[in-house]
Amino acid sequence: MLELASAVGGVDVLWLETRDAIEELKAAVDAIKDFGLPICATMSFDTAGKTMMGITPANLAKRSQELGLIGFGANCGVGAPDLLATITDISRHVSDGTNVISKANCGIPEYREGKIVYTGTKELMAQYVHLALNSGAKIVGGCCGTSFEHIRAMRKAMDEHQMNGTPSLMDIESKVGEMSAGSKAIFAGNDSAPIKVRRSRRGR
């Protein structure tokens, strides 16, 4: 299937996302690396600031570079504030110019009148773009709940963006919402803080 897609569709890069474990990521990379195409990968982090299997942003940065990925970062999770903590920590462990990837959910899903609705507005996702770029991301997008209207606002924000230094916790929370305790620890550079409660997330 990949050979057909490459031949017919002109595939430029292979993309793995919503991973939880390094073993899972490595197995996926091993399965596709013989196609000879560049590989990007993202993992999904919860309110503990780690993946479901306990992988920290620093772990991801180290192993992704060892695997030879051309880009890596975070997707899905529990919303922009927590994902920005992940991106900030990944950026501490890579060199300038590394393709750090940021793909946040469009807010938190809520069940309303019989359907799932994501709470993120166009304005929130535009602010998220500015914060992600200032946090070190080179590739910025949206994950669950992101519509074409959000993408339009995000594209405009990217076109107008001016780099302004790594945002503080106050900057992030004032613009896109509160960060969980576990993600605050990661944001502060402490990836060993014990976290007892993790919020469910997912949307592959």
Question: Language model features by range: what are they?
Answer:
Residues 1-204:
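Domain-level signal for soluble alpha/beta catalytic cores
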